[in-house]
Amino acid sequence: MVGLSESLRRGERLRSGGESVALADVRLLPPLQPPSIRDFVAFEEHVEGIVRSMSDDATVPEQWYLAPTFYFTNPHTLRATGDEISAPAGSVALDFELEVAAVIGALSGSDGGNLTVEQSHEAIFGYTIFNDWSARDIQGREMRVSLGPCKGKDFGTTLGPWIVTADEFEAKHDAEGFLPVGMSVSINGVPFGNDLLSNMGWPFAELVAYASRNSRVVPGDVLGSGTAGSGCLAEIWGRVGSRMPPPLQPGDVVRMEVEGIGWIENRVVGGIQLAPVVPARPRPRLERTTR
């Protein structure tokens, strides 16, 4: 993967000699096929609502403040703006998550491991909108096993509509490296939630550095911010104590907008029916023998 400066030079050459096509005349695809997708949980307000949905105590766990937390999701089920989305078989609690993602570019003089915050800032190629679709009923069951999420998340992630290169945001960073840009989500044209990207607990450069700690990030990796405050149904369910507003239904249209990037939009459709999952068999534990 070439660096940001070279990508901009190549883009300018193509633009100067190429034929233009109206955006309305093309179907956008996901802006890249990432090697991996990490999704953080970096917004304190979101954590408060989710914690309340699981208990009467809305206190953010102390562990959240100690270091960023993320999970890996599926890079092979990406959706683009305009694509249809359906809940996985057996789920009746489809939800969205309003996020922004950083995309890793060229890593000059590094294999992507143990990056400093300064190196991580330079490694960010650009930013895109990230909708982490979620089946809350499946996710809730999985999380009780103290592992996951897995099947409650891996059926679909929307990235798009494109990647805005990091240089477009450089002057917008505050003194601590945060990006105070607006982000919002609506359902069927009705505003639902909004937040500032700068309300993250850590700026993106620190998230990238943490992801590379005792590990590696590579060109094309996607790192999601986690859900913005008021950026999903489940957070509101936790605050009001019931599933109101209700889970997404076929026909609903979810639109997300981020200042400086654009918007993505997906329509919910009915899903396919699959055979029920076979539960674990209750079996007697055989006594081990030694030789």
Model-derived regions: residue spans:
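Catalytic-pocket segment enriched in acidic/His residues
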Residues: 5, 136-291
